[in-house]
């Protein structure tokens, strides 16, 4: 058995054993473990994933729902709103600090009907503050947010749909 298969199997067993609880860094799929960083902040996100009906690149394929952007509010462990998450993807704190991310790794969510878990590399694009030193973001514990299973027709008015989702974002610094 390959190492990746072993890591995935162990992670899934750990997740199954901890069903109903938040994932810990120890239960992550191997490909999502942040490299040499320490967790600085854990945020809960509640919002929507916005999809738009677009023509497929192949003219013989049907139109498809394509992710446009997330729109979510970010909350600390005490339930206080501390920022927002939006297109880019960006995370912006209420103090004005902001980061933009790019996907480094992804893994299917253990829960059916949930958007994937992600590891993103980030860079600061705002002023100094809570998010300015963040170098990686981990998206875990996702619920919902998946594109509609129904077909779409490009050019039809209302060709966008907002799908509710929630997730935990763990922010890391070097």
Residue ranges and their predicted role:
Residues 1, 21-23:
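Polar low-complexity intrinsically disordered regions
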Residues 1-8:
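Bacterial N-terminal signal peptides that target proteins for export
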Residues 24-51, 57-174:
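Primary mode marks residue(s) on the alpha4-beta5-alpha5 output face of response regulator receiver
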């Amino acid at each position: 058995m390959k190492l990746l298969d072993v890591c995935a199997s162990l992670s899934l067993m750990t997740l199954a054993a901890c069903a109903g609880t938040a994932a810990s860094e120890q239960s992550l799929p191997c490909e999502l473990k942040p490299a040499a960083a320490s967790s600085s902040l854990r945020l809960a996100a509640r919002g929507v994933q916005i999809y738009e009906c677009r023509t497929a690149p192949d003219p013989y394929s049907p139109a498809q729902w394509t992710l446009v952007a997330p729109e979510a509010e970010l909350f600390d462990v005490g339930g206080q709103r501390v920022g927002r998450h939006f297109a880019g993807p960006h995370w912006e704190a209420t103090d004005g600090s902001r980061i933009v991310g790019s996907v480094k790794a992804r893994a299917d969510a253990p829960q059916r009907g949930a958007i994937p878990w992600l590891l993103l590399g980030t860079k600061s694009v705002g002023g100094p503050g809570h998010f300015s030193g963040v170098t990686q973001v981990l998206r875990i514990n996702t619920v919902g947010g998946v594109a509609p299973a129904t077909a779409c027709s490009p050019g039809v008015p209302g060709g966008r749909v907002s799908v509710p989702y929630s997730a935990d974002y763990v922010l890391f610094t070097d």
